[in-house]
């Protein structure tokens, strides 16, 4: 009887329990967009990044974080601060189904990993983290924080070409189609009014 109770407790846990988002490269995301039905590219960067840095063709903009008017030092550099978009899940739910393939793209894979986890926890079955992002990580980049810091200091000290530049990986690196054009169909719906798909 005890075994049956354990199976019921752990076997019937909430949707997404223990599940992690799938991780793919932008080139794999592009292939899915062209071959797998009900697949959508969701650019979770801020509206400013989407407009001024450019975005993939047919990428829906649903910012995971929003800029504030607070300017402060964060990590290594002073910059405008970001805050969590409190209606991110609500807005996604107005347009996309929990069974759609949602390919989440940001600048370098940092925010997309967080957003994909949040979608999985909310019951979205096919949330994908496009982990190389639109622009890719800053060069050089390492997962090990100590190694990352050491090599970045080394590159900075020696004036290595491309230091702190992106585009060594990501959507643009692969030469995938992107644009600056702002099609209202793909702009963040609250900025327009009614949701569109």
Regions found by a protein language model. Name each.
Residues 2-13:
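Bacterial N-terminal signal peptides
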Residues 46:
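Short, glycine/acidic-enriched loop or turn micro-motifs at the edges of active sites
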Residues 105:
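Short, surface-exposed ligand- or partner-binding patches at beta-edge/loop junctions that are enriched
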């Amino acid at each position: 009887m005890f075994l049956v109770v354990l199976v019921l407790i752990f076997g019937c846990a909430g949707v997404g329990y223990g599940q992690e988002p799938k991780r793919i490269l932008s080139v794999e995301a592009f292939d899915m967009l062209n071959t797998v039905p009900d697949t959508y590219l969701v650019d979770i960067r801020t509206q400013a990044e989407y407009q001024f840095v450019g975005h993939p063709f047919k990428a829906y903009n649903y910012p995971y974080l929003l800029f504030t008017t607070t300017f402060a030092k964060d990590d290594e550099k002073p910059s405008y601060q970001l805050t969590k978009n409190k209606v991110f899940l609500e807005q996604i739910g107005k347009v996309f189904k929990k069974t759609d393939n949602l390919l989440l793209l940001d600048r370098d894979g940092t925010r997309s990993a967080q957003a994909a986890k949040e979608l999985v926890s909310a019951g979205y079955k096919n949330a994908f983290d496009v982990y190389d992002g639109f622009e890719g990580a800053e060069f050089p980049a390492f997962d090990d924080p100590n190694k990352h810091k050491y090599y970045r200091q080394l590159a900075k000290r020696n004036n290595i070409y491309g230091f702190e530049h992106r585009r060594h990986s990501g959507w643009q690196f692969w030469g995938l189609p992107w644009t600056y054009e702002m099609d209202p169909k793909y702009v963040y719906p609250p900025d327009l009014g009614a949701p569109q798909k």
